[in-house]
A protein has these predicted regions:
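RNase H-like, Mg2+-dependent phosphodiesterase core
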Residues: 1-303
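A short, hydrophobic C-terminal helix/tail in secreted or cell-surface proteins
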Residues: 304-308
């Protein structure tokens, strides 16, 4: 079933946040108007924004989803709000398994894939803990704290696969495709949980064009349940919890690798990463024991030197 188009969104904002939104819209030549019970209303193209005196911000129009996701959430609210409005809708309370990964875009460290089983009581507990998409939690310490709380929730089952660099590189050598590795990993953590609990369905964030990338790796138990892959699946509590579990495991394993190497191994694929890779080479340490070798960064250290 296709996702329902989002053309309206409401959230609470402070006076300062409303002023920040107003300034943003003014700079982009929105037309302002008077609206009953509101400080202001503004419109341009396919977007209408109204700041009510009650503290509510109303966003309407076909551009609602894009504007909320790319400006309002990251720049003003500093948290995810779109997709969480129906957080206690019936489908959020159904028994299911959520799956997510961490480390795919990081040069150093493992690829981690986690699955989490939830039901109604577990979801309500996750809501109280403050579970949300791990990408919206900037502090590694906070990720660690929430991950511990998730594992303490009665009945909440977790499974994790951490493909350390050497293992990851061997798999990539065979599969030659990151999505194939992800498909195998997602299927594995799903099957592992299904051996411990009966769940009618599973959901994961969409990383491939078709669900077949995962389904072809499923075994007997996995083939019997509903499986859904969709964009922004982290708005689902089960997937959000899996994203936190995966991120905590990734950060912990990356830290261990750094300790082993005797240097700090940064996240991502920035200039700091290149400097750390150069340090590993200088120390005569095998790069494939610390990094994902198909990244372009590796070409700087594995390609033969050009001849004069």
């Amino acid at each position: 079933m296709p996702e329902k188009e989002i053309t309206s969104h409401t959230c609470e904002v402070t006076t300062l946040q409303a002023d920040q939104v107003k300034s943003y819209l003014h700079d982009r030549l929105f037309t302002f108007r008077e609206v009953p019970y509101a400080f202001w209303g503004a419109a341009k193209g396919k977007l209408n924004v109204t700041a009510f005196k009650s503290g509510k911000l109303l966003v309407q129009g076909k551009d609602t989803k894009e504007w909320v996701e790319f400006f309002l959430e990251p720049e003003v609210l500093k948290k995810a709000s779109l997709g969480y409005e129906l957080e206690l809708a019936p489908e959020q309370l159904e028994p299911r398994i959520g799956i997510d990964e961490s480390g795919k875009g990081d040069f150093f460290g493992p690829l981690v894939i986690a699955s989490v089983y939830v039901n109604e009581s577990i979801v309500r507990a996750l809501k109280e803990i403050g579970v949300k998409d791990s990408k919206l939690i900037k502090s590694d310490k906070k990720i660690e704290e929430i991950a511990k709380e998730i594992k303490r929730v009665p009945g909440c089952l977790v499974d994790v696969i951490a493909l350390m660099p050497e293992t990851y590189n061997r798999l990539y050598g065979k599969m030659r495709n990151v999505n194939e590795i992800l498909g195998w990993g997602h299927a594995s953590v799903l099957e592992n949980l299904l051996c411990r609990v009966d769940a009618p369905k599973a959901i994961s964030d969409q990383f491939a064009r078709t669900e077949w990338t995962i389904k072809k790796h499923l075994k007997e138990k996995g083939k019997k349940i509903e499986f859904h892959q969709r964009h922004k699946a982290e708005s689902d509590y089960a997937v959000a919890a899996a994203s936190i579990i995966a991120r905590e495991e990734f950060v912990r394993r990356l830290r261990q690798l750094g300790t082993k190497a005797g240097i700090d191994l940064p996240k991502g694929a920035s200039s700091l990463v290149k400097k750390a890779a150069a340090q590993l080479i200088k120390k005569s340490l095998p790069l494939d024991a610390y990094a994902k070798m198909h990244f372009k960064t590796c070409l700087l250290y594995t390609s033969p030197s050009p001849r004069d």
